Amino acid sequence: MKAFMDKEFMLQSATAQHLYHDYAEDMPICDYHCHIPPREIYENRRFDNIAQVWLGGRNPDGSYFGDHYKWRVMRSNGVPEEYITGDKPDRERFQKFAEALPMAIGNPMYHWTNLELHRFFGYEGVLNGDTAEEVWNLCNDKLQHDPKLTVRGLIEQSNVAFIGTTDDPIDDLEWHKKIKEDPTIKFTVAPSFRPDKALNIQKPGFVEYMGKLAEVVGKEKLACIDCVCDALTKRIEFFVEMGRRATDHGLDYVPYREATKEEVNAIYQKAMAGEAVTVEETEKYQTYILIHLGKQYHRLNVAMQIHYNCLRGVNRKMNSLLGPDTGFDMINTATCGGEIASLLSALNDTDECPKTIIYSLNPGDDAQIGTILGCFQNSEVPGKIQHGSAWWFNDHKIGMEEQMTRLASLGLLGNFVGMLTDSRSFLSYTRLDYFRRILCNIIGQWVEDGEYPNDEKALEKIVKGICFDNAKRYFAL
């Protein structure tokens, strides 16, 4: 029987162990998509206790922050909500999580949690209800006193070279500016442009949001669709000045419905007058804006990320109580491969298709995405159109294996830009180690089985590329 989580964890062959330890383990990290707050990086926050890091709490505006992966584990174990997002003492909240964790056998949360304890706190045991007090005391002492366990310390010891946060177009990027001007911060932190609220013409709050966007660009209002496009372009350019390498779109599904500028302008005027827009009108507006944005991304050499097929807030009661991003989302089954291809084709018609990374929350879309990639590659950069890494409900062992083997079967795994954390936690960089172990195990097994030659030079290039070098090239770091 193998020991739990030893140095060869998840590495099931001698070749896998060699690839991981000699090529993958010490590569820098490019976390090109995450949700960590830049303010905490600049202020070099020190957490009071492990529950603050893992379970979060409330923001000053009353919204909730924290790891909804962990919240779902706790809810699934019957833990009352008052211990999850409520006001129970942190020690009691931590106890409930510790008691739930052993039930998460086979869940990546079990591995991630114990990897974090091993890596950052030197804890060689496992977390459960019986060890909770011991772990609580150890972690809190280190969090409060160890200079390596401030926010910057965690980032530096994890060998993170680049962090791409997720930011709204109306954000003033104050904390990014301060980070950029601070010579003591050696890693790069850049904003990512996420204009979802400007695209969601069908949702409540659109009119108010467009008023805020107008204010940010120095206008009294955005009177027409050209004004909207101009405002978004100005904000894109501002983000680029602040170091932006990528954008991100979180879409229910990818639309494609062509319309003239006059049609789209009429739809926009209708929405701004407070009238409801139809599904068809929404798709026409979104398509028009996506094409405009895609052209700007290409002009400015930034990558476009598209995340789709998430059905959000399906528990209406809890969503109304706690708000978005609190653990009540699910995989959707929207079919929009043709629309994705049409969007890329429209941009390609004028040679203005940007570098694009496509993620679906539904793993059933993997083969479709894999075949879309090959239709729009060109010589701008190897792997210009990417199949995004296993995302959210798929970033577990099986999900990562399936995403990478599907990509390998239909495209070039060797040009893959690799994994990201998509996290709100500064301890989550162990997820990149988890990914690297799975990657090396897959490739190692192919070599062991005689399905790929034991070509040291080629294997080194592939492994190092997927771990960091490809992302460095792709995002022009």
Annotate each language-model stretch with its function:
Residues 310, 315:
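Hard-cation-handling environments
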Residues 2-300, 352-354, 358-370, 374-477:
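Metal-cofactor-binding active-site regions of metalloenzymes
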Residues 333-340:
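Divalent-cation-assisted or electrostatically stabilized phosphate/pyrophosphate-binding catalytic cores
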Residues 319-327:
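Short glycine/proline- and charge-enriched loop/turn segments
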Residues 343-349:
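Short, basic/hydrophobic alpha-helical segments
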Residues 304-306:
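C-terminal amphipathic alpha-helical interaction region
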Residues 43-44, 317-319:
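Short secondary-structure transition/capping segments
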